[in-house]
Amino acid sequence: MSSNVTTNNLPFDKEIVDIVDYVLNFKIDSELAYKTSWYCFLDTIGCGLESLEYDACKKLLGPIVPGQKVPLGVRVPGTNFELDPVQGAFSIGAAIRWLDFNDTWLAAEWGHPSDNLGGILATADWLSRHFVAEGKPSLSMKDVLTAMIKAHEIQGCIALENSFNKVGLDHVILVKVASTAVVAAMMGLTREQILNAVSLAWVDGQSLRTYRHFPNAGSRKSWAAGDATSRAVRLALIAQTGEMGYPTALTARTWGFYDVSFKGEKFTFQRPYSSYVMENVLFKISYPAEFHAQTAVEAAMKIYREMQNAGKNSEDISRIDIRTHEACIRIIDKKGPLRNPADRDHTIQYMVAVPLIFGRLTARDYEDDIAADPRIDALREKIVCKEDPEFTRDYHDPEKRSIANAVTVHFTDGSSIGEIAIEYPVGHKRRREEGMPLLLEKFKKNLSRVFSPAEQSAIENLLLDYDRFTSASVTEVMDLLVKK
């Protein structure tokens, strides 16, 4: 019979303590972080609205018991659901991530920090509706932005130096940990309870990357973050009851996360938690493509226009060379059959072939009917990726954080176009001035997919005015985003 020992008298692992003290005590005073988080909120909500056009996403959303409405429940943008906070977090989070079009963070581990908005927004709406019913003020959207900045920071700072993919774990583990800490603080848990909650996140069984790679790449990658951020809300609620935590969840010999799941290695950290990640986050603005391919797609679009001017088409191409960085080759350099949209949007050859044939890359282009065009697979076979060590160094340089690709297209007549090299995608911090107007256009287009012109106007009047937005109540904003 195994023994059960209560370990609450142990000191918590420093890594857990640092997360909790940051969430409770660090004051965000960066205007750049707040302004960027506002853009991030708009973009993330828009991504969720676009996902509602896809039945594969919609079938997963809503109450577990069909037709159920929870009193004072969480609203899900673009729908009329009223859900409990856990299922609300899943529905918001799954919609956000479905099309792989929300923000990105690239480091030793990659990920999409705005995935945390599923748990944050569900918690904020649920708390606020109960506050208002009790005669108390709602949380403000500034509170939501603060939570976003902190969740981004936790996920992104751990990711800077620590590769979960190299041990086969999916990056949504960091969504679970970051969301747990932030939503627990939003709920008003004590420091001890938040420590317990974060430890519970680390001792959970963690998602494997199985569903992101050949031969099993599939649609779970589109709802994995929704699952993680909703699990975070559940763990925070469990901790709120007074349930115990596990102080050495990371460092316990044999049974802790490091020994079980991280090959005995401990996390290393490049910088303390502040607001660095939100300030430097990457937005997917132009194309719904895995971020390591964004600059390659942009280069392919430029080459397509030159091909048109030269009177050439994709059937005239003999070879395509792509100079790229190591992470791109490791994650999205694929040969062979691609079985579904989730497989295609993580294959650089597919994402370059489509714009060279059609002069576009949209979410629809990953669907089966488009993929059936034989020209796509024929062109994929002609694409060769090769690592450029300088691109890899600049990818990891914290002052550059480039995501460079260089594309050259060779033709059967011996001519060529390129090389076209692009270091930074439109959504990069170094191209913010160029990118933000395009991001707002993306948001407006996504609003138009769901709302009437009058509804769009009301939403834009509030959400696109930064000062009005940050002072607005969560319930006011969420009520605007409900599908009437």
Residue spans for each PLM region:
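Terminal-appendage/accessory-domain detector
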Residues: 1-110, 213-230, 237-484
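Extended, well-ordered alpha-helical scaffold segments
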Residues: 12-15, 19, 63, 136-151, ...
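Well-ordered alpha-helical scaffold segments within catalytic/enzyme domains
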Residues: 51, 120-130, 180-187, 235-239, ...
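Hydrophobic alpha-helical hairpins/lids featuring a short glycine-rich hinge
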Residues: 96-158
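Well-ordered alpha-helical segments within folded domains of soluble proteins
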Residues: 114-122, 175-182, 229-234, 293-297, ...
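Structural helix-adjacent loops and short alpha-helical linkers that scaffold large soluble proteins
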Residues: 127-145, 188-195, 244-248, 308, ...
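Long, well-ordered core segments of solenoidal/helical folds
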Residues: 150-159, 198-209
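Aromatic-lined, polymer-binding surfaces characteristic
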Residues: 153-183, 225
